């Protein structure tokens, strides 16, 4: 990177980002997932959050609907409202936290413009199975035909590489043509402050050329102009860097097994670095407050449109995990769980 011409390294470029960087990422995706992307299919963005805003700016008309599966990252609602859209929630299936496809099919209307999926999932750590993705895609294809509309599937993928036990994370453009992928390097390379990511818009998407051009302009008009130039060049040098998930996996198993032994109920996470735990009392916010007495910080499930649960993050040191377990034991005892 030091060998780059400074006026290029720190200068303006196409709103879509440096072409050589986009081509390098496209080739990496093609090797990994058997896709056929080129530089033109990628828009470099200021992280995934900005990428989602670019996508909604590009596709949403006022009053159109975006469907999301609870629990979900609550800022999705703000992103949709930024462009006068309406968020439609699908209630969770708390037995598996796979998408509730029956309710999903019932809530698709002629106003439905997009559906957001996030896998590996925040806050549950669940990975949507290939069977789930195929069924979801089939429903969308049938509804597009029924209503004569285009419905985009927005795949928010900041945790893609963080998967355990050999679990495969399906690449959604291979299952549904009208997919837009939003990716961030914040989690995979631990670069959240650098704000770098991208959108993928495949050629197979309806009106792809116009969609790609509109997304590049949207990148500018929402105020980003372009993704940070320096970190774009850095990313191009490490697109095939592999994430060492061993430390996360060690923490995952220690925390999950430790809490289960104490009597807590939780789904075993397959990806990301979160554990979604059922609160032993109806008011999970009170449970979170009680945890603070033992230096345990939890996020209430109502912050993800799923009350009655709490989210724990295990992206900390192994010592922190192990030192927390006796404190969780005290918390379990306070709430009458098996200790």
Which positions does each model-derived feature cover?
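PLP-dependent class I/II
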Residues: 1-5, 13-16, 20-339
């Amino acid at each position: 990177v030091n060998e780059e011409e400074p006026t290029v390294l720190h200068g303006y470029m196409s709103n879509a980002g440096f072409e050589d960087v986009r081509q390098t990422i496209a080739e990496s995706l093609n090797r990994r997932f058997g896709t056929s992307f080129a530089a033109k299919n990628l828009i470099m963005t200021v992280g995934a959050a900005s990428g989602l805003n670019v996508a909604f700016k590009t596709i949403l008309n006022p009053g159109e609907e975006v469907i999301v599966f609870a629990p979900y990252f609550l800022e999705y609602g703000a992103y949709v409202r930024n462009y006068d859209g309406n968020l439609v929630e699908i209630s969770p299936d708390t037995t598996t936290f796979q998408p509730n496809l029956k309710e999903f099919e019932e809530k698709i209307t002629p106003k439905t413009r997009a559906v957001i999926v996030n896998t590996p999932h925040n806050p549950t750590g669940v990975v949507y199975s290939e069977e789930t993705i195929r069924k979801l895609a089939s429903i969308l294809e049938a509804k597009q035909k029924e209503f004569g509309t285009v419905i985009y599937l927005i795949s928010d993928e900041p945790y893609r590489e963080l998967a355990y036990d050999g679990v495969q994370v399906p690449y959604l453009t291979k299952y549904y043509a009208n997919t837009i992928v939003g990716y961030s390097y914040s989690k995979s390379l631990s670069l959240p402050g650098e704000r770098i990511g991208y959108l993928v818009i495949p050629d197979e998407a309806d009106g792809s050329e116009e969609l790609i051009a509109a997304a590049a302009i949207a990148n500018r008009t929402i105020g980003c102009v372009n993704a940070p130039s320096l970190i774009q060049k850095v990313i191009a040098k490490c697109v095939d860097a592999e994430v060492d998930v061993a430390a996360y996996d060690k923490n995952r198993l220690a925390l999950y097994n430790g809490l289960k032994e104490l009597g807590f109920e939780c789904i075993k996470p397959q990806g990301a670095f979160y554990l979604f735990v059922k609160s032993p009392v109806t008011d999970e916010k009170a449970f979170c407050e009680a945890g603070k007495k033992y230096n345990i910080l939890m996020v209430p499930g109502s912050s993800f449109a799923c009350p009655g649960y709490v989210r724990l993050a295990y992206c900390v040191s192994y010592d922190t995990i192990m030192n927390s377990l006796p404190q969780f034991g005290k918390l379990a005892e306070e709430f009458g769980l098996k200790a």
